[in-house]
Amino acid sequence: MPKKIVKGFTTNPSLMRKAGAKDYKSYSKKILKICNNKPVSLEVFADEYKQMKQQALQINTWGKNVYVKVPVANSRGIFMGKIIKELNNLNIKLNITAVYSAKQTEKILKLINKKTRVIISIFAGRAADTGKDPVPEFKKSISIAKKFKNVEILWASVREPYNFLQAKQLGCHIITIPPATIEKIENFGKTFDQLTKETVKAFLVDSKKSKFKI
């Protein structure tokens, strides 16, 4: 099942650093070689408009399956509407990331055309980490984006396998899932009795390895 649900690939500067990438371009090219027939989102890492645009234009040349990933705002909280609109008008496929609210989604939709493909990545897990329920933001974002056949809403920042079902139930077009979580999706469909048996077996294995005595 996990392999069947994988339809594309995305990364960001933080994940690249965690993966040990030393050279942005060569690392990205390796990804594109592996995922040559699937959509791949590659993120700019500049914080200023001019450099961000230069990077976006270059990244866009790396493949027809590339989505250029740009943040909805820079590190100072400045809305990146100008670059979003310009790149969209150049028919560059975009993945607009670090979105948290339907208000941000609405601002994006006011700028883009209705033909060039756009992904809006809403960070569910990080929002939930602060005690905020991301579901209402998804519901509203999905609703207002319905008029745009070229726009897909993405559930980002997954925290648990159940998020996969939540995203599907809400009508999200895409959900980004780390490999470890994809493997856990194999547990879907197991009965509570099966889970109890597996859990107790794990306790037994660990207690034997620990050589516990009372």
Model-inferred region functions:
Residues 1-6, 10-86, 90, 124-127:
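Active-site beta->alpha loop and helix N-cap motifs at the rims of alpha/beta catalytic domains
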Residues 24-29, 34, 58-62, 84-86, ...:
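Generic alpha-helical propensity signal that fires on short helical segments
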